[in-house]
Structure formats: C-alpha cells, structure tokens
Design a protein with these regions (language model features):
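Non-catalytic pre-domain segments flanking phosphatase-related domains
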Residues: 1-13, 32, 39
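Active-site phosphate-binding/coordination module
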Residues: 28-133
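Short, structured coil segments at secondary-structure junctions
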Residues: 61-64, 71-72, 80, 184-186, ...
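Mg2+-dependent phosphoryl-transfer enzymes with acidic/Ser/Thr/Gly-rich catalytic loops
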Residues: 2-10, 26-27, 183, 198-283
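Conserved acidic, metal-coordinating active-site core of Asp-based
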Residues: 101, 105-107, 112-228
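Short, acidic loop-to-helix structural element flanking the phosphoryl-transfer center
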Residues: 24-40, 87-94, 146-151, 202-216, ...
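Asp-based phosphoryl-transfer active-site loop
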Residues: 7-22, 98
C-alpha cells in the first residue's frame, strides 16, 4: 500500500461491488471497520446508485450513518434532520423524451422518482429475461412499483426524475452500446454501474459533485475524503476524493484513476484497507 499523509474525516462508500459482497451482504469484517472509523470521528457515507430505502437494512441501520449520497449523486441527505443538502434531477419532459428513444431499443427501463422506483408493467414482467444475476433481479422486483405505462405516469404526475435505468440483454451488448448511448444523450450523465445496465442522471447528478457538496456542508476540505468504488458511476468520486480507492474487481478505468487498489468486494476489501489506515492513524 502507498504511503499516505492526510487523516481522512469522511469515507464515501459505493455499495454494490464495493462495500457489499456479490451476494449483496455486509460482512462482519466490513461492519467492524466502519464502526471503528466512525468511533474515531470519521463520517461514514453510503454513496450509491440506489435510493436510501433500497439499501440493505444492514447498512441503513448502522448507527454511524447520518449522511447519504444516493441515486448516483442526484440527492444528498441528512438522515437525522431529513434535510436535502443537494439535489439534481432530470426535468419531467426530458425524461419522457429519453424514454421515447429507449422504446426503440432492445432494453427494459425504469426510473427513480421521489426516492422510489417505477416501471411499465410489461417491462417489469420481462425482468427475468434481461437480468441473470438473481440478487440484482430480486432488487429490481422488490424496489419497483409497476405502473400501466411509465411515460403516461410521468405526464400525469408532472414530477422530475432522479434517474433512468435500463438493461440490455447482455453485458457484451451494453459494452458495445454504451458509447452510442452517451452520444444519444449528450446533455445527460450516462454511465454503467454493473453488468448489463446503463444509468442516466442529470449532468450535476454524479458522485463526485455530490461528495464535494457534502464536504462543503461539513466544512471539510475534499482532500480529507476517502472514496471506495468499482463501477464507472464511481469514477467521478474516485477522482474527486483526497484518496480514491478502487476495488480489485473494479472496472479497468476506475482502477486506472484510483490512488490505491483494495482487495475485491468478496474478500472484505473495504474493511481490510480501512484496517491498515486505522493502524497507521490515518482514520
């Protein structure tokens, strides 16, 4: 591990592929490391593409969780007061336009609005055909409310959208199509978090900008933040943090941008890396 000089007062943690195991579980080793760092005064901040209620109970119930960066940075919230510290959403009309274009592609899609997921009923029923990972499929089915037709639902509610997510049939198709998707929606933040999914957010909804906003709120220099991630939606915070740490199982672009590499998410990678920092007095 490289030598580091700064004490880290805020730890931003991606969940899927980073803090959680491939089975979407929080290990006891990772839990102990988080509580130990919190005991020394560090802010422990889940930083995820999920909305808060979509996080595993084992994470949500940690006594050290006050702040959360959710939906890829579309929202930063003080969970103690309920105050939303940062918000960046896709305007209602633009979200509908995006979905009209997605209707021409071989994908299923959904959206997050007001901290919950919504999906057209017929697309919801196709989930098992597009999502082979049983843990991801379970998350999709449990955290989406089927509606007769999503675009009509958005027109009716008039609400802005926190995130649009869609799935290609295969990972290979997603890799091939991602540059095309980024060119198709140049005014939006288009990235991939896992497997065969693509996620679309407002331009200001990214984990890096959200991390900076939270640091400003807390009066901390961003140089005193530590960020762990694995996916392309983590790249902005890996680059923004005082120290960005990529998981061994991470995307090559994320690993190339990181200041250090932690063991994989299936090997208590976050906890093991944090234990070293704790031993060095850097947390």
């Amino acid at each position: 591990m490289p030598e580091f000089e700064l004490p880290y007062r805020l730890i931003a943690l991606d969940l899927d592929g980073t803090l959680l195991t491939p089975q979407k579980e929080l290990t006891e080793g990772n839990r102990r490391a988080l509580l130990a760092a919190a005991g020394r005064g560090a802010h422990i901040v889940p930083t995820t593409g999920r909305f808060f209620e979509g996080m595993p109970e084992a994470v949500r119930s940690l006594p050290c969780i006050r702040y959360a960066i959710t939906i890829n940075g579309a929202q930063v919230q003080d969970r103690q007061t309920g105050e939303v510290l940062y918000r960046a959403e896709i305007p209602n009309r633009r979200a509908i336009e995006v979905m009209e274009q997605l209707d021409t592609l071989p994908v299923i899609y959904d959206c997050y609005m007001d901290n919950w997921g919504y999906m057209t009923e017929t697309l919801y029923a196709q989930g098992p055909a597009y999502i082979q990972d049983p843990h991801v499929l379970k998350m999709l089915l449990e955290l989406r409310k089927p509606v007769p037709e999503l675009k009509a639902f958005l027109r009716e509610t008039g609400r802005d959208v926190q995130k649009i997510q869609f799935f290609f049939p295969t990972v290979e198709e997603r890799i091939r199509r991602l540059p095309q998707m980024q060119a198709l929606f140049p005014d939006l933040n288009v990235c991939s978090a896992l497997g065969n999914n693509v996620e679309i957010n407002a331009p200001a909804a990214n984990k890096g900008d959200a991390l900076k906003a939270l640091c400003r709120h807390l009066g901390l220099p961003v140089s005193q933040s530590l960020a762990f991630g694995d996916g392309l939606n983590d790249l902005s915070m890996i680059q923004a943090a005082g120290l960005g740490v990529a998981m061994e199982n991470g995307d090559p672009a994320v690993k190339a941008a990181a200041g250090a590499i932690a063991p994989s998410c299936g090997e208590d990678g976050v906890g093991r890396f944090m234990e070293t920092l704790l031993e060095q007095g850097l947390l």
